[in-house]
């Protein structure tokens, strides 16, 4: 068999064996959070929103501009774009950017966004969008997004529970850490986190998002190849193998 062809086949085989996941910068980690809040330190509210009137959709955001927090009813959608159904709660302790230093966060892998859904009788809710932004002064230096909507069949009743925890995936944690490594410890502590979110099937509320510090080592998630990637790799391997067989047959 031609050595070059063999190298291509081996390369495709290695690509097939390498885990590949769909883009998702923020991932839900069921190993953290819950009523006991295992693996989390103190939480600080960053965003509070509630579906207006008898509606079941809600959205809200907070970011940094001109040295102050900017609160809005606009929330990001994981499917793309934004929605502005509202309504964001603007109380001093309800919606505000939070500093990394205020949470004792020094590493990107320690950042946790905790979603506390307050639904009647612990009913279901769907988080339809979530974006975390890191601000250095007024400059947005880093964004991480939820890859797809996440539905929670049951929720914790009452406000103040630890809720559902989202953290950066390994690639995004490394990317943010690379930025943090360029700053002094004081500059890292001064960085602020902003948030944009949306939810559906929200009949109670208000829903809150907290910033927390991950004190436990995150569990490494096993990645599964995407169907499209798997099909492409298998097809390519079969095709190249057939081509190699044809060439080898002609030599006899």
Describe each PLM feature range:
Residues 18-24:
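Sec/Tat signal peptide C-region and signal peptidase I cleavage site
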Residues 242-252:
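C-terminal membrane-anchoring or membrane-association module
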């Amino acid at each position: 068999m031609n050595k070059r062809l063999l190298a291509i086949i081996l390369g495709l085989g290695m690509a097939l064996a390498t885990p590949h996941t769909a883009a998702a910068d923020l991932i839900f980690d069921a190993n953290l959070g819950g009523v006991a809040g295992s693996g989390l330190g103190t939480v600080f509210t960053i965003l509070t929103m509630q579906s207006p009137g008898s509606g079941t959709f809600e959205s809200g955001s907070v970011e940094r501009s001109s040295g102050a927090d900017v609160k809005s009813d606009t929330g990001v959608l994981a499917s793309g774009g934004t929605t502005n159904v509202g309504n964001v709660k603007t109380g001093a302790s309800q919606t505000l950017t939070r500093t990394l230093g205020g949470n004792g966060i020094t590493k990107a892998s320690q950042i946790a966004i905790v979603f506390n859904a307050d639904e009647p009788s612990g009913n279901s809710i769907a988080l339809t969008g979530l974006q975390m932004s890191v601000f250095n002064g007024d400059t947005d230096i880093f964004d991480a997004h939820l890859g797809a909507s996440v539905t929670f069949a049951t929720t914790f009743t009452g406000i103040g529970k630890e809720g559902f925890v989202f953290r950066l995936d390994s690639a995004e944690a490394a990317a943010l850490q690379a930025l943090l490594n360029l700053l002094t410890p004081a500059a890292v502590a001064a960085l602020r986190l902003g948030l944009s979110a949306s939810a559906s099937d929200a009949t109670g509320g208000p829903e809150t998002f907290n910033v927390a510090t991950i004190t436990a080592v995150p569990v490494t998630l096993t990645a599964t190849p995407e169907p499209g990637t798997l099909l492409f790799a298998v097809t390519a391997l079969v095709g190249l193998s057939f081509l190699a067989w044809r060439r080898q047959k002609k030599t006899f």
